[in-house]
């Protein structure tokens, strides 16, 4: 299990996920918009 001395905790995970989403946000939004346009055109 995780000990109190462990430096990797839930807050680190949240910050890592937030940072990753912020880096990939534009690409993800473009993909979503493209997929939506393809669905709307079909």
From Swiss-Prot:
UniProt key word Secreted: yes
The organism's place on the tree of life at top rank: Eukaryota
Subcellular location per the Swiss-Prot or TrEMBL entry: Secreted
GO cellular component: a single term: extracellular region
Annotated tissue distribution: Expressed by the venom gland.
Function: Catalyzes the hydrolysis of phosphatidylcholine with phospholipase A1 activity. May act as an allergen and induce hemolytic activity.
Family named by the database record: Belongs to the AB hydrolase superfamily. Lipase family.
Name of the protein in its database record: Phospholipase A1
Source organism of this protein record: Polistes gallicus (Paper wasp)
């Amino acid at each position: 299990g995780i000990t109190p001395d462990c430096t990797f905790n839930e807050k680190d995970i949240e910050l890592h996920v937030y940072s990753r989403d912020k880096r990939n946000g534009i690409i993800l939004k473009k993909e979503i918009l493209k997929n939506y346009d393809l669905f709307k055109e079909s």
